[in-house]
């Protein structure tokens, strides 16, 4: 019998959720996703030190010798995310997701500006917009930024998505893809209820993605649904048939080593009709979010966590820049 991973790949686009190039080589996904935490983890591996140096050197050359170190580090942060993305694109046939600075999550204009800058860096290296997804947090401001960017042919992946109303707002904005989280929703419910576990069919994260998928397909939305943030392979198999699923190397390995029959659970051709289309303006969106304690808390936690990862990455880049430029100064 084929592995779960092989069977899943025949009904769902499998995406690698990692910045580790070796893991991507191993599992041959179509697409890959990164985020600040994953880039930070990869940047701390000795194997990728050369990519950090490349980002810093390119940024210094771009800004000139008179530029302040803080400005070089800021530029290098964008450069590093794109450098990793370009390396990943050498290994996959599809798209890479590169995230906008999470600290801009409540600033529409700054998010648009940053996204344009990121895509321009890819374009400068001959990479077309079709191979890049710009990841943006699913705040109202982020969704509005994505709406503008999509009209400029800059494709967006709306992340940190924890409830149905965030998904609806994204679909109405015409975004290319959403990443509804599964495991982080489960974490919240386990903590809130004191339950140790949920059967996969009752897992609140699985239930959330299933509802979003069926709503999109039954109402003709073109926005792709990519389940994300998994805690176990049971969550993944319960969403077999979803447009895409982005999966960590650890869980990809478990799927690859497990051999059992995998039935399709979500079917785009035969979606369950849940409810009619609804329209959300900013007021109704914010009311729906305010009424959902889990989504509000997890969105805030996610933005905070990614922002802290960016701060750490900037510190790492700053230390490395001082070391490199200190060594250069000593040789002159």
UniProtKB/Swiss-Prot annotation:
TM region positions: none
Example of a GO MF term: transaldolase activity
Active site feature: 135
Documented EC number(s): 2.2.1.2
GO terms, biological process: carbohydrate metabolic process; pentose-phosphate shunt
Pathway entry: Carbohydrate degradation; pentose phosphate pathway; D-glyceraldehyde 3-phosphate and beta-D-fructose 6-phosphate from D-ribose 5-phosphate and D-xylulose 5-phosphate (non-oxidative stage): step 2/3
Pfam families registered for this protein in UniProt: TAL_FSA
Domain of life of the organism encoding this protein: Bacteria
Catalysis: reaction(s): D-sedoheptulose 7-phosphate + D-glyceraldehyde 3-phosphate = D-erythrose 4-phosphate + beta-D-fructose 6-phosphate
Disulfide bonds: none
Subcellular location: Cytoplasm
Enzyme class per UniProt: transferase
Sorted UniProt keywords: Cytoplasm, Pentose shunt, Schiff base, Transferase
Known partners and oligomeric status: Homodimer.
Family from the record: Belongs to the transaldolase family. Type 1 subfamily.
Purpose: Transaldolase is important for the balance of metabolites in the pentose-phosphate pathway.
NCBIfam families found in the cross-reference section: PRK12309.1, talAB
Protein name (Swiss-Prot/TrEMBL): Transaldolase
